[in-house]
Amino acid sequence: MDKFRWHPEFDFSKVRIRYIDRPKGYSEVSGDDIKEIGHMFIYLYSGAAIPHHRIVEIRYGEEVVWRRP
């Protein structure tokens, strides 16, 4: 995630994170929604916090760069 956030060749707004959102099922946020990437949580500008263990997929544009096995 830090690679996409800080490297000048990447546009962080193209990052999409899919995660388990209880009780809804799955939800997705973009890089523009992310305020801070912490040790155990991703903090959003909305005030929500996504635990890292609930992340199931990370995409950059249309490419899946990480998927939970």
Swiss-Prot record:
Pfam families: MJ1316 (PF04457). It comes from the Archaea. Disulfide bonds: none annotated. Belongs to the UPF0248 family. This is UPF0248 protein AF_0420. The lineage of its organism: Archaea, Methanobacteriati, Methanobacteriota, Archaeoglobi, Archaeoglobales.
